[in-house]
Amino acid sequence: MNKKIIKANRLTGEVTPPPSKSILHRYIIASSLANGVSKIENISYSDDIIATIEAMEKLGAKIEKKDNYLLIDGSKTFDKKYLNNNAEIDCNESGSTLRFLFPLSIVKKNKISFKGKGKLFKRPLNSYFENFDKYKIKYSYINKNEILLDGELKSGEYEIDGDISSQFITGLLFSLPLLNGNSKISIKGKLESSSYIDITLDCLNKFGIKIINNSYQEFIIEGNQTYKSGDYEVEADYSQVAFFLVANSIGSNIKINGLNTNSLQGDKKIIDFISQIDNWNKKEKLILDGSETPDIIPILSLKACTSKKEIEIVNIARLRIKESDRLKATVKELSKLGFDLLEKEDSILINSRKDFNKINNNSLVYLSSHSDHRIAMTIAIALTCYNGEIILDNLYCVKKSYPNFWEVFLSLGGKIYEYLG
């Protein structure tokens, strides 16, 4: 596994964050379902995005890839020659690709397999399976990293648990408008990560699809709708912006370009979290609810570690089924740098009441990315609080979401050396 020595002090400079991966996935899919050509500008070819592009091509979309834009023609999507032809969709490690396209791939009768790697198929799919059983859609595991789907999605009533992943809802919201009859999605329990549904609904509206949202407890979908092509630019990704915002709040000086202050992205909440931490002056523990923002919990934990306060980030059990057990990985790796964190079943407790400036350590500490892009990037920012060098494994797992992160890190003054040990 690739290992490098990494060091950082105060990061300074200017960054233009990558486009929102969440929005880009959705624009690619919607464009691929539209009659006509759409132009999607501001593109980053991360591993996850490449997986979605190639998947939609397998379903018949014509996608022309340019340096910073895509031209997508969906007029041939779901043509007969793309159905029942033993097609195989490789999702790599992209949960969005898998869960968005699982129902979409069978809006017409189809037999198709999905494969992936890493922990992809350890992430739950039961929310789909329970509904597929109801409508007699067949599914079977070929092996631990591949599943065969055989059947046709039907209009009707679907029930989805609200506390597992909003991706199941998004997959159905893309698919059900294309069917002949009307449909309803009912949410069991409280919907978490509702901001991702807002992004989906906004995308669908842009492409001409109308959904009735009844307070996030049910969604009414009229059938026989048609996606309309269009030209759109993808805004900056607050999931990645969060790393630089936290870096600035703990001593770096980075100018961040191109932010949409009116963004629907839930991870924009990092701004509020930073403010809450900085302005908390009570003796009791500060409690932060991470249920709506799972992707920024590692970097939020770092911010909490530097605050000289006791902070607990709660409602984050879902982090255990990400690319890694992200809750455990966050605690384990930041603890190696001298921070005081406690892993709980559904939360992280951080006690940083001691005076904090920089952690001094002259030894070379070994840290693991856990092959998780967000852990790797959190470690990079954590080094601005650390007097010393670390060894990091598999640092290029960042390609999943931010392919040029380490180039940006170097441009801001970070250091990366070969590890010859």
PLM regions: where:
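Short, structured segments at the rim of ligand-binding sites
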Residues: 1-421
